[in-house]
A protein has these predicted regions:
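Bacterial N-terminal signal peptides that target proteins for export
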Residues: 1-10
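Sequence/structural signature of beta-propeller domains
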Residues: 20-356
């Protein structure tokens, strides 16, 4: 009887260890907002039509092509990470869709030699095979807004998450961020009939990472490690430098999308999505100093953005609604419809934060 009692006590203790272990409870959004640094409010001037996948976490990351001749005819490429890529006009209307399966993040570069002629290269992180990351390449036709698939390039062992493009003297590189924090710089050659890639540098962050952006002027790579914060890798380096911690103040985890506004030779701003409190954190360049935060809130006819994954930012004239630049944020909660992307005038953000 004592043996049975002892065994029962041991069993009960084991069950308690499993069942009574501390449970990490999510902090309510109102508390996260209250604990974080203040954020100024701006409203969106436009939004895209929802992606095609309903009632799911589907929209993820946008990229921008600016039409210098006719800025109002610029285009947006956005991922539906369960289906493929959409192309939108600045009016938010869908112009094209290409079935590419599970593509997560996207970026693009103009004036890239594609099959012997200059064109707009679109690159997405392809996670259709979770064990083997790939880069999916496309050509964007600015006249028709149509995407043409060019093929895929190996991106390393692991699941593809983030991607961003950079250009230097060697050419155009895709920086593919794997789920485990590994980052490969892959030099792309799309000039021939079949695109090829060569891994020229590998970096590593400790945990799950995704959003990234490259400053082509300096070669610096900025990467968001979701639970940790924003890092910088200098050109050619494999050693990360912390820019901003996900401390619940400046950045509330997850740190997600990263975008850059380049001004002059080295100036401008880096923006990171502070997903945990529906805000965006801004650091100045070149000193990488924290300068403030903003939030996209509900306007008269267009909703705000919440739980943002990917963001994009480009300066320049985008027509009367966006004369100084365009900021785009994925909206994780778009009413009763599928997720979409919100369009914000950079001038409104500059005014709200009192930036130069």
């Amino acid at each position: 009887m004592r043996a049975l009692l002892k065994q029962g006590t041991i069993l009960a203790g084991a069950l308690c260890l499993a069942a009574c272990a501390p449970v990490e409870r999510e902090i309510p959004i109102a508390q996260r907002i209250a604990s974080a640094n203040p954020a100024v409010s701006v409203t969106a001037r436009g939004e895209t039509e929802p992606v095609g996948t309903n009632n799911a976490d589907a929209a993820d990351d946008p990229a921008i092509w600016r039409n210098a001749v006719n800025p109002a005819a610029s285009l947006i490429v956005g991922t539906d990470k369960k289906a493929g890529l959409y192309v939108y006009g600045l009016d938010g209307a869908k112009r094209d869709f290409i079935d590419a399966g599970r593509v997560n993040n996207v970026d693009l570069k103009a004036d890239v030699t594609i099959s012997g002629a200059p064109g707009i290269l679109v690159v997405a992180s392809d996670r259709n095979d979770v064990a083997n990351a790939k880069l999916a390449l496309f050509r964007l036709d600015p006249a028709s807004a149509k995407l043409t698939a060019l093929g895929t390039i190996a991106g390393g062992a692991g699941e593809a998450y983030g991607v961003c493009l950079g250009r230097d003297a060697q050419g155009v590189s895709a920086y593919i961020v794997l789920k485990d924090g590994t980052i490969h710089q892959v030099l792309i050659d799309a000039s021939g009939a079949t695109p090829t890639g060569k891994t020229v540098r590998t970096m590593k962050l400790g945990t799950q990472s995704e959003g990234c952006v490259v400053d082509d002027r300096t070669g610096k790579l900025y990467v968001a490690e979701e639970d940790v914060g924003l890092w910088r890798f200098d050109a050619g380096s494999t050693s990360p430098v912390m820019i901003g911690a996900a401390d619940g103040k400046a950045i509330v985890a997850d740190a997600e999308g990263v975008a850059l506004a380049a001004m002059g030779e080295t100036g401008g701003y880096v923006v990171v999505s502070s997903q945990g409190d529906n805000a965006y954190t801004v650091y100045s360049l070149p000193d990488e100093r924290y300068v403030g935060r903003f939030r996209v809130v509900d306007g008269a006819s267009i909703g705000g953005s919440e739980e943002t994954d990917g963001i994009e930012l480009m300066l320049g004239d985008f027509g009367p609604a966006y004369p100084g630049g365009l900021f785009i944020a994925q909206d994780g909660h778009n009413g009763a419809m599928a997720q979409n992307f919100k369009l914000v005038a950079w001038a409104d953000i500059v005014a709200a934060l009192g930036l130069n």
